[in-house]
Amino acid sequence: MFISTRLRVLGRRCRTAAFTLVELLVVIAIIGVLIGLLLPAIQAAREAGRRSSCGNNLRQLGLGLHNYESAKGKFPPGFQREYGSTTTNDGFSGAGAQGNWAWGSFILPYMEYATVAETLDMTGTTCAEAMANGTKAAAMKKRMPGFLCPSDATRPTGLTDINFNNAAGTNVGSGWAMSNYVAANNSGDTARNGDGMFFMDSEVKIKDITDGTTKTIALGERVWRNFNGVTGTDPGNSQTLSGSIKPQAGCVFCVRGTRQQSSWGIRDGLGAMPTGGGINKPSSIISYTESVSARSFCSSYHPGGAQCTMADGSTRFFSESTSLGVMRNLIAIADGQPVSGDY
């Protein structure tokens, strides 16, 4: 009798302690709400980590620039002119004209990529020759994390539309290591002789940056943006382009191939501030007659703006509200209009 009563009491306690279906649904709903509240915070924390890693990349690139400057007494050229077999005196007209090694290739020995620089032997090999050499080309196609922004998840493993031809005019392939960081070329459109730190055969010294190294941009971000089915006109040589137009981020090693005689061609490693440009502008490409999307910097997938390396090697974040005029003044190294105050 006593045992039977005790079992009934325990049974009632067990039934009372169990969840009802309604209670279970309430618990699930509460968990869902908590996840919904926490997820944005988790995503924001992850993006903060990616932005920090991106900033560290830019600082290391800035250190590479200054190590080069300490060794050579000048900053590396935006890109080095290469004369083709039938070029005229300017090194750009005629078959075989090429854009040679770009700024990124010159600082490799002063970063963690010294072995890549040794493989390429840039002092004795042109960029076109390296691309046609199996061993050197393989080195140029390896992913280089120090040149990539972790927030740009849209980028491919390598550039596929550089169309860099060798001296014989034969396409030498694709897949070259891309870079999310481009060098400041001009306060207007991209140009062979821009007013920024990096242009064709540039030899900018610290003393040339009269606006101040803390008030001059050296490098900035540029995301990969792929717009398919766009038809436009190359403003440099009036060749009509159609199909997949890709204003990609940049290339670690070189500027574009035989079209580098126009400002349209040197966009692969250099950035500028043409009319209509600005931080994360334009958000879409209309046509190459606009020319802005292919050349504008800076752009990123960091919420609210993009990061730049200043000429003194420091890194700073620029918001999307930063005006085009301010960005242009920050790119020009000696326009006599140094930007002051909070920008």
Predicted regions and their residues:
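Structural motif corresponding to the C-terminal cap of alpha-helices
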Residues: 5, 38-41, 46, 69, ...
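Enriched but not universal
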Residues: 4, 22-25, 46, 339-343
